[in-house]
Amino acid sequence: MNYFELFKFSPAFDIDTAVLAERYRELQRAVHPDKFAHDTEQQKLLSVQRTAQVNDGYQTLKDPIRRAEHLLSLRGIDLSHETTTVKDTVFLMQQMEWREALEDIRHSTDPQESIDELYQSFAEYRAKLTHMLTVQLNSSKDEDALLAADQVRKLKFMAKLHDELTRIEDALLD
């Protein structure tokens, strides 16, 4: 299913999330199962299915990584079940530095400062990747779509690192 069509957007990485939320509420009202309480079982089932599609579409388009994956899937590149690893050596070196920094937090004299520095480093790198991703997804060239897939892989990895940093921070606060 093309969620951009469902929510009446042109397929693009940059979308207005306020408009997305508004259209989500409109679609929810239109397909909500309560509206079909007195209809046939088939109509009720269809309403439940449509509600699930609307919910999934909203969650997909709301999240930048999932939105990028969806755009790529519409172009024939499915990242949902892949095991391809990032081969960019610069990124792999940066990844190793971040991993070492995560390990060093536990032994730091000022762990909160180390945590804040890592959050800042993640934010800067993520902004750079997101900019490149936007440019690549707006291109119609096949090679740019493949490059965009690499940016998505990197962003997914960074999301995991961010979650790990949050867990470390939470553990230090306990």
UniProtKB/Swiss-Prot annotation:
Keywords: Chaperone. It comes from the Bacteria. Pfam families: HSCB_C (PF07743). SUPFAM superfamilies: Chaperone J-domain, HSC20 (HSCB), C-terminal oligomerisation domain. Residues 2-74 form the J domain. Disulfide bonds: none annotated. InterPro entries: DnaJ_domain (IPR001623), HscB (IPR004640), HscB_C_sf (IPR036386), HscB_oligo_C (IPR009073), J_dom_sf (IPR036869). GO terms for cellular component: iron-sulfur cluster transfer complex. GO terms for biological process: [2Fe-2S] cluster assembly; protein complex oligomerization; protein folding. The keyword Chaperone applies. The keyword Acetylation does not apply. SMART domains: DnaJ. GO terms for molecular function: ATPase activator activity; protein-folding chaperone binding. Co-chaperone involved in the maturation of iron-sulfur cluster-containing proteins. Seems to help targeting proteins to be folded toward HscA. Interacts with HscA and stimulates its ATPase activity. This is Co-chaperone protein HscB homolog. It comes from Shewanella putrefaciens (strain CN-32 / ATCC BAA-453). The gene is hscB.
